Amino acid sequence: MKNQFFATLLLACSITTVSAQIPVYMDDAQPIEARVKDALSRMTLEEKVALCHAQSKFSSAGVPRLGIPELWMSDGPHGVRAEINWNDWGYANWTNDSITAFPALTCLAATWNPEMSAKYGKAIGEESRYREKDVLLGPGVNIYRTPMNGRNFEYMGEDPYLASVMCVPYIQELQKNGVAACVKHYALNNQELWRGHIDVNLSDRALYEIYLPAFKAAVEEGGAWSIMGAYNKIRGQHACHNDFALNKILKGDWKFDGCVITDWGGAHDTYEAAVNGLDIEMGSYTNGLTSESAFTYNDYYLANPYLQMLKDGKVPMSTIDDKASRILRLIFRTAMNRQKPYGSITTEAHYAAAREIGNEGIVLLKNASVVKKGAPLLPIDAAKYRNILVVGDNAVRLLNQGGGSSELKVKDMVSPLDGLRAVYGDKVAYAKGYAAGRPMYGRADEIPQNMVDSCLLYTSPSP
């Protein structure tokens, strides 16, 4: 018994000693702000600067010497993008990065149902976590202002109140998975044409009543951990290092304590990036900052040029301490958050959520009566029609993605034609009718004229 007592005492002392040796920044039981302060005090200037810029296409550095991990980011307007190569835009061709295709955010907004937004955020958050992403580049809350904006489908409509209400539960549920929302594109990126240099000038009333409410709600109500800057200028200064938008409004008025991350290639000036509120620079062109070159991330505006300005006293040291503190806070909330769940991917629950959101978001503009049948066409009554003709290239294409940042690698997807055939069987005939892309004529003779009872045309408006 005596030996057992001493063994227990020795074990207790050992545990106490080990616990006492854990640095504050590594101790999950400590408040995040104490961990940030402790980690910052241990870092060199070079390590702080390294946090502020990309080390690959979709990651930024950690602090290996201190065991602080890097941040991994992913596009995700409506699904987690497939893995990209370290240093170019080619796909890595992994075999385990297929995901669920969720409806576009314009469909989510069309549900007018915050519960659907919560389901969306939860499901896409679980898939992001399973894929070991720390930052999901979304949701997008820019306001519709031109129908020719090819990215309107990524956003939540033209009404600032609707976008404000719908983005909050998405962000909250996403971040419960230890994955940061990166709300984009802040601000006034409402058209894609000339987006890299267009200068947006507007009244304060329009800014605060139309274009900022969704971002404000994302920060103050949703608690967003990161914000993506836009490509455009705002009143003469680029949005990614705009003093008025970032320091005055976002970090000042709204008390945002997270990170501002550039859109890829959105930084343009080292001094402005240093003092005007930018925290992490991603995707810049690195060969003289005009074209891409291999492994030259140290040439970024917030890399060696920033380090040199700090050493020369041209910008205050307080700027790097603020940036590093914000980035550390983000890392502790995500990559170093040991309480986060493991996540899951392509589950039946995720498919069910995607279907439910899609069903609620569908808007039927017109369901005209069929002259001969005397009733609305939809839903098609199989008993009334012997044959159903489906025409159009889009009936056999998987319309689950856009291009670039909204590309998806989907595990399971059903085309409209396959879906119709699953319901109506051999009654469904198909004619391509046209090829997607530029118009092609002369295909009318492909339509089987003698067997048409009902016709569904799958098309899309010309841009």
Listing of model-derived features with the role each one plays in the protein:
Residues 20-460:
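Glycoside hydrolase catalytic-domain context in secreted enzymes
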